[in-house]
């Protein structure tokens, strides 16, 4: 990766920036103070090896913080900075959203005071993991110490412990909020904190976790090694995307998806289990129903043994209209190219959502949020990397779902809130439902809700209002109205 600066253990200088601001929420002016800084991690020899960069928002008119929650938030990847959740819905400034399927990736972009900001009820800490955003891997020889499921989680815990001591927040309620792979990070970090790390224990506990675009499963690594057909787990999302574009029914998306799931849980999964032993009558029934619910053609289903491949689905559902749908948001489309040029599976994702929004987020974050935070850092800001290509996926203690179960059983008051988009083809909500059915989680403390969105639930003014309201209620101890 090319950079315009080079860091070495003997020359790295930690950065720290402070600012003050005010925001009006529900008619009340709220003052806040921000501290953006490097959180340096040192090796056994005392030399700095890496830094996790944090952007902290403190409400400055609160004197006693013992009962004031702190929300620690990040994106996923692995290899993504916190830019998306920061500029998307958690900062005091955020993007102003327009239509979902915007035609151009170019400006003008609008950034506004965030009317839904959680600063009214909680302090907020946004986190750039090592090697992302302004986070830095200082010693390049130490990649294996940070770029892996457990390594990443322990680096986070190391920094959070130090941050909590530094700002005297040991008594404050603490919440994790992760998006996408950030859900994996949250579950593993909470599990390790409740039990034991590779070499040490941690003195931090979490009151709750918000999972946005869930990646916590009973499999080895998201969808790997799951004892169920992925076509069945993805089926409810396929139905949601088909409902949005092809309008097969007058039902609401919730009712249509619920009906599709009931079919997938019984007739469809049984047909896939039978395989070639299925009768012609049964096969016709399955072909008709699967095509109706998902929008995929009979011809495709016959060629693929009634199964649906995730990559193929994005090309198939609107094939007759000459369009492909986005992996990150099935509502967003682009022209369908020739098959030999289209997608080039596993090598190129020409994703319509990323095409439209990545530049928007970067412009908003670097052009507005950073100046407002008084961050003046002559360092490459890395929105995202390909660390996931080289990530250590080994989990010595079990699956991500097991880590979450460890945390919730050892911390009896801990709660979990899963938020998923009906049109998210990246982390399909069927996986979250499967996790909640098979992970042994305490059901009275686990909540799920679907949103009229894709992977990034906060895209769209209605969605960002709803999501922030639900998270606010969750932090205040109210149980979200679970749709699961």
Where are these regions (language model features)?
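N-terminal cap/lid subdomain of alpha/beta-hydrolase-fold enzymes
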Residues: 2-4, 46-145
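A catalytic-pocket lid/entrance helix-loop region that shapes and gates access to the active site
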Residues: 94-96, 190, 194-293
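Alpha/beta-hydrolase active-site loop
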Residues: 119-120, 129, 146-166
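Alpha/beta-hydrolase fold nucleophile elbow
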Residues: 169-181
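Alpha/beta-hydrolase fold catalytic core
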Residues: 275-426
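Short alpha-helix in the alpha/beta-hydrolase fold that links the catalytic acid
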Residues: 414, 428-438
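Catalytic histidine neighborhood in serine/cysteine hydrolases
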Residues: 440-456
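Catalytic histidine-centered segment of alpha/beta-hydrolase-like enzymes
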Residues: 454-464
């Amino acid at each position: 990766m090319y950079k315009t600066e080079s860091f070495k253990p003997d020359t790295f200088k930690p950065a720290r920036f402070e600012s003050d601001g005010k925001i009006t929420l529900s008619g009340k002016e709220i003052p806040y103070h921000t501290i953006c800084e490097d959180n340096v991690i040192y090796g056994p020899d005392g030399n700095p090896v890496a830094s996790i960069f944090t952007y902290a928002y403190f409400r400055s008119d609160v004197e006693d913080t013992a009962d004031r929650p702190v929300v620690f938030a990040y994106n996923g990847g692995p290899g993504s900075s916190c830019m998306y959740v920061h500029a998307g819905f958690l900062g005091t400034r955020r993007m102003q959203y327009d239509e979902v399927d915007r035609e151009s990736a170019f400006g003008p972009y609008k950034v506004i005071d965030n009317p839904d900001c959680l600063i009214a009820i909680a302090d907020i800490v946004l986190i750039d993991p090592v090697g992302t955003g302004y986070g830095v891997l200082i010693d390049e020889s130490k990649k294996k110490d940070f770029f892996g499921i457990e390594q990443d989680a322990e680096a986070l815990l190391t920094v959070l412990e130090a941050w909590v001591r530094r700002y005297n927040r040991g008594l404050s309620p603490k919440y994790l909020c992760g998006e996408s792979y950030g859900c994996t990070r949250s579950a593993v970090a909470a599990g390790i904190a409740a039990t034991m790390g590779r070499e040490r224990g941690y003195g931090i506990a979490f009151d709750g976790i918000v999972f946005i675009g869930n990646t916590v499963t009973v499999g080895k690594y998201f969808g790997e090694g799951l004892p169920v057909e992925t076509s069945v787990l993805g089926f409810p999302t396929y139905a949601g995307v088909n409902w949005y574009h092809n309008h097969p029914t007058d039902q609401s998306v919730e009712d249509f998806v619920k009906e599709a799931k009931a079919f997938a849980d019984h007739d469809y999964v049984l047909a896939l289990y039978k395989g070639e032993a299925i009768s012609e009558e049964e096969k016709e029934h399955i072909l008709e129903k699967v095509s109706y619910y998902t929008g995929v053609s009979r011809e495709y289903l016959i060629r693929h043994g009634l199964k649906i491949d995730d990559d193929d689905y994005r090309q198939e559902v609107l094939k007759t209209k000459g369009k492909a749908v986005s992996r990150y948001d099935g509502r967003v489309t682009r022209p369908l190219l020739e098959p030999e040029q289209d997608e080039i599976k596993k090598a190129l994702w020409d994703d319509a959502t990323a095409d439209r929004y990545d530049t928007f987020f970067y412009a908003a974050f670097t052009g507005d949020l950073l100046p407002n935070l008084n961050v003046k850092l002559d360092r490459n800001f890395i929105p995202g990397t390909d660390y996931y290509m080289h990530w250590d996926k080994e989990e010595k203690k079990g699956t991500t779902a097991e880590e979450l179960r460890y945390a919730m059983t050892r911390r009896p008051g801990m709660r979990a809130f899963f938020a998923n988009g009906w049109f998210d083809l990246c982390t399909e909500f069927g996986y979250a439902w499967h996790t909640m059915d098979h992970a042994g989680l305490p059901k009275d403390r686990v909540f799920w809700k679907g949103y009229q969105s894709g992977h990034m639930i906060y895209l769209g003014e209605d969605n960002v209002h709803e999501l922030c309201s639900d998270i606010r209620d969750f932090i205040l101890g109210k149980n979200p109205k679970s749709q699961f």
